[in-house]
Amino acid sequence: MENQTIALLKECSAGCRMAEESMCQIRKATDDQKLGALIAEYKGKHEKLKARVDSMLAAEGYAPKEPPMMASAFAKASTGVKLSWKEDSHQAAKILMDGCSMGIKTISSHINQSPEASAESLGAAKDLVRMEEEFNRELKRFV
């Protein structure tokens, strides 16, 4: 149980960090005020959930997991390339939607592989999936 709990929390922490990095990069590249406000709102939600998850990890004596360096570098480069093709709010929203979909798939997979994880960690992971689903829905108006 403890191993599944810790692994799930670490994935949630890393996922929140990756999402925050992407949102910062994309927010700088868009001048659409409504999209910028939506990104800021969800960045704040990710920061809040990350703090919750990180405190659960700390209570168990573990440090938060940083996103894998290669994955982080690839995501940043990929986002930069996609934005260079067409730097507008439509492209920015599409990139963020892709990120939401990836987060939903990744965290849902970890939830399914962690049936023995604590109820609190499963709750945090499910909250992250719901947040990504909501963000994805709200981004549709910008594509």
Region annotations inferred by a language model:
Residues 55-104:
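Carboxylate-rich helix-loop segments that flank metal/cofactor sites and access channels
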Residues 36-70, 139-143:
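Conserved alpha-helical segments that form or flank metal/cofactor-binding pockets of metalloenzymes
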Residues 24, 28-31, 35, 58, ...:
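Short, flexible helix-adjacent loops and helix caps
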Residues 20, 50, 54-57, 78-81, ...:
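A structural signal for well-ordered alpha-helices, especially hydrophobic packing surfaces
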Residues 4-12, 33-51, 89-96, 119-131:
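Alpha-helical scaffold segments that form or flank carboxylate-/histidine-based iron centers
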Residues 1-30, 91-115:
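Alpha-helical bundle segments that constitute or directly flank the non-heme di-iron/ferroxidase center
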Residues 62-67, 116-123:
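Short, highly charge-biased, low-complexity peptide segments
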